[in-house]
Amino acid sequence: MKIEPLYDKTDFVIIQDYLSKCGVKDVNLWLKHKYLDDVNNYANIDEFCKKLYNAFTNKQKIYLLVDSDLDGFMSSSMFYVYCHSVYKDCCINPIFHTGKQHGLDNIVMEEIKQYKPSLLVVLDAGTNDVKQDKELKSLGWDIICADHHEREKINPYCTLVNNQISTKVKNKSLSGTGVSWKVCKAYDTKYGFNYANGLISYVAIANIGDGMSFLTPENETFRYWGTRDIHYNLKPFVCDFNGYLTDNKSFSFGMVTNINSLIRLGTQKDKEILFYALCGKIEPEEIICVCKKLHSKQSRDTKSLLEKDVDIIYNGKIILARVSKSTPLTGLVANKMMGEHNKPIILTQRDGEELKGSVRSPIDLKDILPSNLFNYNLGHQRAFGTSYQISNEKDIIDYIDSLESLPEPTQAVFMSLRTSDVPNYLFGFVDENKAYFGEGIPIPKVHFQKFGIYNKEIQLLGANQRTVKFHRDGIDFIFFNCTNKIKELLHLNDLSKKRVTLEFIGELGYNEFRGNKTKQCIIDMSTLDIHDYRIDFM
């Protein structure tokens, strides 16, 4: 395990120190929660607003492509709410993907071409859909797009608002919903409305859900104000999925993952109902239940795929793997595999002579892969969709073999400590500052140096005996979902007394139960290193 401690055990750290260490350039500005990039710094934003205004005044039907992830649903539902605020009688027709596609894929294109040409709005996608936009333009369509993905080619066929191509915009880590909000704010300014500020909850949640960096003061501004007073359309989702909690972690494991489950596994009708519930047009209780059921199904299906349907084709510096059945869960499965192997994963499924799927990596990878061997690699540097021809797979493997090395994944940790050396203040540090932790500013975790422990000191808890707990130096150490393999390594079923060596990374905090407050460490199981105990005499 290669670790990089940020601090020494003798350091006393305050949140300002930690923010600076993570990469916040101006901590005082960041903590004021008041910074926003000027909407006028966005290229083409005035033209976008004019085309939208003309569509309203001419009573055109507006077609809105709802991209197939949380950021896509947030941007589109926010835009729908905004449009109906400024022009109550506007006619907006949402278009939904059939799966986890993005932008103007072939199926969406066939649907659009059935309609009478009008205005098409594409949010959180579309930057590189040059061929599709050219075809639609020739048929009489007008296309306006607000996106945050990197531009790979010039697109003269749509009006594109994008933070990546706007040289005056500082925040390159804003979500698609954030860029869409900029358009709404610009429309407010240009035509004398004041509705955009009330919609920042959509941006805050999308920034979390799409893994946007919180090192930028603008994203912290959206988080701070967007979660202080959740928009009434979104409150039922936040209350049910998050248990009323509004820190980034609660969103990531609550509302974000549940909604993404429906987007992956739900029917077209489910997606439509979810969209209108996020818009506040229908009551959300039923679709919230559907999200929960599909999230449970997603967990079961991911586990089953990993155990039964994934074959590793090549295990080198990068793992190439194939899933034998069609599934929308390649991203989740690849993420699990990355945690297990601690190296980049390219997981695909066969579609004729093409292999399509997902890439997950602990290092920046997208730009390392040779574009001439892939049909596309679309997304972020460490998480993106991929496609290549089967005939290219050998060349891809040869290319990976030719790489001298990849950067070794490094685990950045708050401190590296012995169990006896943990400063008391660290147990309250996370709870006191949890609102600030997110992408780029991770929850502080501690690396625990190797120590020996007897199997008889370790407890198995819970009805399924899958929770592991042991007590050491005044701290309760816990991890969940213990596998049979780990039970064997820990000798938990052995009758004889055996000693093992443990090393791991964990998150510190306090556990309160019936008025008792105890120190606790939740172990990150993907970092758990177990060996039979031995003494080195030389």
Language model regions located:
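Short alpha-helical basic/polar micro-motif
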Residues: 178, 331, 335, 504
